[in-house]
Amino acid sequence: MSSGRIVQIIGAVIDVEFPRDLVPNVYDALKVQGAETTLEVQQQLGDGIVRTIAMGSTEGLKRGLDVVNTGTGISVPVGKQTLGRIMDVLGNPIDEAGPIGEEERWTIHRAAPSYSEQAGGNELLETGIKVIDLVCPFAKGGKVGLFGGAGVGKTVNMMELIRNIAMEHSGYSVFAGVGERTREGNDFYHEMKDSNVLDKVALVYGQMNEPPGNRLRVALTGLTMAEKFRDEGRDVLLFVDNIYRYTLAGTEVSALLGRMPSAVGYQPTLAEEMGVLQERITSTKNGSITSVQAVYVPADDLTDPSPATTFAHLDATVVLSRDIASLGIYPAVDPLDSTSRQLDPLVIGQEHYDTARGVQYVLQRYKELKDIIAILGMDELSEQDKQLVSRARKIQRFLSQPFFVAEVFTGSPGKYVPLKETIRGFSGILNGDYDHLPEQAFYMVGSIDEAIEKAKKL
């Protein structure tokens, strides 16, 4: 336990001088004496001076204060005691419900599992959300990205996924709120409480108003808790909202440390930082981590370096579209843009594959015909195309679904649709079994039987 003293403070960056033979390692956690602040070593500048990032506010700190090296990285509580609790980046409880009472703490910087320990699998994870199960099915132990601009429903989709998976699969989840709104974190906590699934979720928050150090490390804190559950032999879910803010915090820290920026002002280590996080989110022979990550897309530009770097790591991408949201179709998932590695007849079966591809073909053809319809009207289309357009509009509406977590806003009860029902409904529409029903009957219903019932009332 060596000690040093603060020699410089610039915002969240603090330089600390140690005896030359006792300089802390990079990523060691330092504690400021007489303050609650923890610092993390980022660079060794020479002459016994290390440059650190503060994991919290630097208000009230001054030069000359004593700093103690803990000798290890930041460590956080892991295990069942974390379930139902809200913690910050350092693992301290922030829900005013007393100490965590953990039996074990792990450091947040860990090596990814080796090749020999990793395990692949093709088992599907049913979500109960029609458009996702049909067009971009999730793999157990896979990584999923929810891509979308501001206000198209990333967080609502994520809340619905957590609720459905906790209720239907009774697994443990870890939710890392990275640089998002505190109000959303609060809503999320109460939503989980009302759904009676809070005792299966560990919550870690580093919200928008916190210093960049907190936002950069909070994803690792959540991941460490998930790794513990995985190593105990469980199938655990890790939700990260929002991975873009993780990148953004990295950009801020990089600038504070004086590194040269790269494209669009991002940090030069963008790919490496993303890789360090993503490579740890993997399944081993003991258990699996299935990860769902919300990805904010700046200015709806998917070629921005941050979403583009994230794409490379994912097994499935769910793209939320502003155009679909503007039609009032929620979840606003774009079935033509969203993809999954699992969409393979050898994995999901021929019937599911044919139905998904059939739906995509009909919607793509409808998209092509829209220009003709806009200029010449429906009457100029062939009978075959008229029929296709009618089915496409039904499919488009049938892809919508009332959510449990949005009941308060929509006034209609949420629906969980099993995969078999989803396939039956869409293949029926493609085969023309429901050509006689009006398209309004398919809007905001669960299974196809509900659409038939709704049609009787129209």
UniProtKB/Swiss-Prot annotation:
Its main location: membrane. Keywords: ATP synthesis, ATP-binding, Cell inner membrane, Cell membrane, CF(1), Hydrogen ion transport, Ion transport, Membrane, Nucleotide-binding, Translocase, Transport. Its EC number is 7.1.2.2. It is found in: Cell inner membrane. It is a peripheral membrane protein. GO terms for cellular component: plasma membrane; proton-transporting ATP synthase complex. Pfam families: ATP-synt_ab, ATP-synt_ab_N, ATP-synt_VA_C. GO terms for molecular function: ATP binding; ATP hydrolysis activity; proton-transporting ATP synthase activity, rotational mechanism. ATP binds at G148, G149, A150, G151, V152, G153, K154, T155. It catalyses: ATP + H2O + 4 H(+)(in) = ADP + phosphate + 5 H(+)(out). F-type ATPases have 2 components, CF(1) - the catalytic core - and CF(0) - the membrane proton channel. CF(1) has five subunits: alpha(3), beta(3), gamma(1), delta(1), epsilon(1). CF(0) has three main subunits: a(1), b(2) and c(9-12). The alpha and beta chains form an alternating ring which encloses part of the gamma chain. CF(1) is attached to CF(0) by a central stalk formed by the gamma and epsilon chains, while a peripheral stalk is formed by the delta and b chains. Produces ATP from ADP in the presence of a proton gradient across the membrane. The catalytic sites are hosted primarily by the beta subunits. HAMAP family: ATP_synth_beta_bact. Belongs to the ATPase alpha/beta chains family. PANTHER family: ATP SYNTHASE (PTHR15184), ATP SYNTHASE SUBUNIT BETA, MITOCHONDRIAL (PTHR15184:SF71). This is ATP synthase subunit beta. It comes from Stutzerimonas stutzeri (strain A1501) (Pseudomonas stutzeri).
